[in-house]
C-alpha cells in the first residue's frame, strides 16, 4: 500500500509539476537545478528546450542568471510552469506527474511541449491531469473523473465512441476552436 512506502522513497522517485508551481527567490538556473545542483549546463539547456522555456530565458538580460523574485513574480504563469517542468525533468525520476501544469501556456506551446516530452516519456511513467482534451487525447490511457469518481477509461477513440462525459467535453472544446 502507498501508506507503507517511506516518504523519502516517494520523493526520490516522483516529480510533480503543479498548476501553480513554487519558485524560490533565486535565479532561473538555481530554480531548475535546486534538486540536482551538480548538473552541467548542457543538461540544464536540454531540459529547458524540452519544456520550451530556453528561448524565453535567453531573451532576459541575465539569461539563466536572471533572478525570479519572490515566488517567481518576474515570470509569467506559463514561464513559471515551464521552469517547473524543466526542474522536474532534470530530477530524472521514474514517475512524472503533471497536474494541469500546462494550463497557463497557449495551445501551440502546449502542443510543442507535449511533442518534446514524447521522447522523454519513454524513460518515465507520466501522469497528466488536465481539462484540455488536446492534452489528454494522445495518452495511452485516459481516466475520466467526475466528482472524484472514475466514470470512464480508455484511449481517445474508445472514449469518443462511448458518448459519455469525455465525448461531451470533447464536443464543447472542439466547438470553441
Predicted regions, residues:
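Conserved D-loop/post-Walker B switch-helix segment of ABC ATPase nucleotide-binding domains
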Residues: 106-116
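ABC ATPase nucleotide-binding domain helical subdomain, centered on the C-loop/LSGGQ "ABC signature"
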Residues: 4, 11, 29-70, 114, ...
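ABC nucleotide-binding domain signature
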Residues: 8, 14-19, 127
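ABC-fold ATPase nucleotide-binding domain signature/coupling loops
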Residues: 2, 54-83, 101, 105-108, ...
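C-terminal portion of ABC ATPase nucleotide-binding domains
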Residues: 59-63, 115, 119, 123, ...
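Catalytic Walker B motif of ABC-type/P-loop ATPase nucleotide-binding domains
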Residues: 96-100
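A short, proline-enriched helix->beta-strand linker immediately N-terminal to the Walker B motif
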Residues: 90-94, 123
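Hydrophobic anchor residue at the start of the ABC signature
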Residues: 85, 129
Amino acid at each position: 500500500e502507498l501508506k507503507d512506502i517511506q516518504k523519502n522513497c516517494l520523493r526520490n522517485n516522483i516529480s510533480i509539476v503543479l498548476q501553480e508551481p513554487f519558485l524560490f527567490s533565486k535565479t532561473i538556473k538555481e530554480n531548475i537545478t535546486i534538486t540536482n545542483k551538480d548538473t552541467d549546463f548542457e543538461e540544464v539547456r536540454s531540459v529547458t528546450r524540452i519544456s520550451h522555456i530556453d528561448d524565453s530565458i535567453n531573451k532576459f538580460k541575465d539569461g539563466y542568471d536572471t533572478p525570479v523574485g519572490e515566488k517567481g513574480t518576474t515570470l509569467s504563469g506559463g514561464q513559471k510552469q515551464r521552469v517547473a517542468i524543466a526542474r522536474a525533468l532534470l530530477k530524472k525520476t521514474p514517475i512524472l506527474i503533471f497536474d494541469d501544469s500546462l494550463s497557463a501556456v497557449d495551445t501551440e506551446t502546449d502542443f510543442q511541449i507535449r511533442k518534446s516530452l514524447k521522447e522523454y516519456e519513454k524513460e518515465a511513467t507520466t501522469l497528466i491531469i488536465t481539462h484540455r482534451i488536446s492534452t489528454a487525447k494522445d495518452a495511452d490511457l485516459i481516466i475520466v473523473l467526475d466528482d472524484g469518481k472514475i466514470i470512464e477509461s480508455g484511449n481517445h477513440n474508445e472514449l469518443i465512441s462511448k458518448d459519455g462525459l469525455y465525448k461531451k467535453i470533447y464536443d464543447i472544446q472542439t466547438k470553441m476552436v
